[in-house]
């Protein structure tokens, strides 16, 4: 039995539906408020998205389904096996239309939940940036004038538009990914790669 | 006692193979990496606590035509957030020109050490850096090659595929076959003959290890394996224990330039002792110890009895009997 963690929140239904393609028993399970669902092939655990990579790294579970944005941000020691056909979004720089991306030597204040990604991708670009770490509602950064720009994920861009902000640049595209613990990947290599093979077939159908 | 016993067993095994212990300073003057290092500044000179041992040893070794066998045990330091993390690194190196027996010898010692300490559930994952040298040769942009190598080390296959942005579909298909090697059966055919040769070499290396006593299920071939440090060249490997969360350690074949500007070839293995200590079964490490619990004034009378026990190889420890403390 492979232990898989899936994220609660916006991706939960999609992740569960995705796993149901490979484990019929999961169809019978009612989600309710259960945090553990027993299938025939998988034992599924529901985890908070930001905790999920840690569960995989610590080998509490063998596999995890999580957005690439979280994987990049946390840089946990896991195997990022394959991208999955759901959970699409974009990591963007956004701000008010009148704010320029040219630093002009001034310090640029960026509000974000993604401190590492922002540092990695933007520190060398402007030299001087100040990262303001927010845990949610990042759009408030420019609105309350505590930041010039924000770095965040967007799906449709509606929240940005509703708040008068616009996308300045797409940093990268993200989707759900299948990750594995490194030791599980060695010990369950055949099982995990056979699952990946089925996922690839499904991905091909979706494309 | 447990830690010392483990080191004693490893030291004994290495000595039986003709390996000698080397010791190097804990403070480094020549700093090769900056991240997570612990620095000191003295009279304008920067010193750092060593973050690992292997590389520093290699710098000081002279290359000659006969094999050099060495091992080391010692503390290493790094910053983990704001905490100073101290671990104990153990490793062994066989310095000699690239040869099959050299690589096999280092791996056989791992097997024998595991037998000595009673570990039978382990997996050694085998890779070959030449596979990726071949693939990355097709990418001309050096910066891109560097970041692709990093994705391989991090095992981020998704980012590798995205960043490589390969227009050559044949090459892309070969890369997918490498990443998902064990999932392809008859359909996993490597079209390029050089690539095929490197994969075949890796598989024949595994077969040789099986011939020399490794159980087949203890060895897996993962052509996608990559290790940090660019000095690796040839066979590389990672070692996993069943109940661990991460790899115990790893190593492989390398080419490194020493401080005399000579090329040094070798094959080695290193691991952090704490990771092994967490997992070994405590019972095998118990030494044969006899405690002599007597009143202090009887030490001289007891000394002769303890001496006889020690001659038999039994650890003998005098403990003064203090009524009210020890019964």
From Swiss-Prot, chain A:
Q: Which reaction does it catalyse?
A: 1-(5-phospho-beta-D-ribosyl)-ATP + diphosphate = 5-phospho-alpha-D-ribose 1-diphosphate + ATP
**Mind telling me which NCBIfam families this protein's record contains?**
hisG (TIGR00070)
Q: Which GO terms describe its biological process?
A: L-histidine biosynthetic process
Which domain of life does this protein belong to?
A: Bacteria
Localization recorded for this chain is: Cytoplasm
GO molecular function, one example? ATP binding
What organism is recorded for this protein?
Dictyoglomus turgidum (strain DSM 6724 / Z-1310)
Q: Give the CC-aspect GO terms.
A: cytoplasm
Q: Supply the enzyme class, top level.
A: transferase
The identity of this protein, by name, is ATP phosphoribosyltransferase
Name the gene for this chain.
Answer: hisG
Subunit note? Heteromultimer composed of HisG and HisZ subunits.
């Amino acid at each position: 039995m492979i232990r898989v963690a899936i994220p609660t929140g916006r991706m939960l239904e999609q992740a569960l539906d995705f796993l149901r393609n490979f484990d019929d028993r999961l169809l019978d399970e009612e989600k309710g408020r259960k945090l553990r669902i027993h299938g025939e092939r998988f034992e599924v655990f529901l985890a908070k998205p930001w905790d999920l990579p840690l569960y995989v790294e610590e080998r509490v579970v063998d596999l995890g389904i999580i957005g690439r944005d979280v994987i990049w941000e946390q840089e946990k020691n896991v195997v990022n096996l394959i991208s999955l056909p759901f959970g699409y979004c974009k990591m963007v720089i956004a701000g008010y239309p009148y704010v320029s991306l040219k630093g002009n030597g001034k310090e640029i204040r960026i509000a974000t939940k993604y401190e590492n990604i922002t540092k990695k991708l933007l520190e060398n670009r402007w030299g001087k940036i100040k990262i303001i770490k927010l845990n949610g509602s990042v759009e408030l950064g420019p609105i309350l004038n505590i930041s010039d720009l924000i770095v965040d994920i967007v799906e449709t861009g509606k929240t940005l538009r509703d708040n008068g902000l616009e996308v300045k640049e797409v940093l990268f595209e993200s989707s759900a990914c299948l990750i594995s613990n490194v030791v599980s990947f060695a010990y369950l290599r055949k099982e995990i790669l056979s699952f990946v093979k089925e996922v690839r077939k499904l991905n091909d159908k979706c494309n | 006692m447990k830690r010392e016993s483990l080191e004693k067993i490893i030291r004994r095994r290495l000595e039986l193979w003709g390996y000698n212990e080397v010791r190097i300073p804990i403070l480094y003057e020549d700093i090769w990496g900056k991240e997570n290092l612990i620095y000191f500044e003295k009279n304008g000179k920067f010193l750092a606590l060593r973050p690992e041992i292997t590389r520093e040893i290699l710098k000081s070794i002279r290359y000659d035509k006969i094999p050099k066998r060495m091992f080391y045990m010692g503390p290493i330091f790094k910053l983990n957030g704001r905490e100073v993390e101290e671990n104990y690194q153990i490793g062994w190196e066989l310095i000699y020109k690239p040869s099959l027996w050299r690589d096999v010898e280092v791996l056989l010692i791992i097997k024998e050490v595991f037998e000595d300490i009673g570990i039978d559930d382990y997996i050694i994952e085998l890779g070959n850096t030449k596979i990726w040298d071949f693939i990355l040769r097709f990418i001309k942009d050096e910066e891109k090659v560097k970041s692709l190598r990093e994705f391989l080390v991090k095992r981020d296959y998704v980012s590798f595929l995205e960043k490589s942005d390969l227009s050559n579909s044949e090459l892309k298909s070969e890369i997918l076959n490498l990443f998902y090697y064990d999932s392809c059966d008859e359909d996993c055919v490597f079209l390029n003959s050089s690539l095929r040769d490197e994969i075949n070499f890796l598989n024949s290396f595994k077969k040789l290890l099986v011939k020399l006593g490794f159980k087949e299920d203890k060895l897996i071939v993962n052509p996608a394996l990559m290790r940090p440090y660019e000095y690796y060249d040839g066979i590389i490997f990672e070692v996993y224990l069943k109940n661990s969360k991460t790899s115990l350690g790893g190593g492989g074949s390398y080419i490194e330039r020493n401080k005399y500007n000579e090329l040094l070839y070798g094959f080695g293995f290193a691991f952090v002792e704490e990771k092994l200590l967490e997992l070994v079964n405590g019972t095998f490490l118990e030494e044969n110890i006899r405690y002599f619990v007597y009143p202090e004034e009887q030490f001289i009378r007891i000394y002769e009895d303890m001496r006889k026990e020690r001659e038999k190889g039994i650890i003998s420890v005098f403990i003064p009997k203090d009524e009210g403390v020890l019964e």
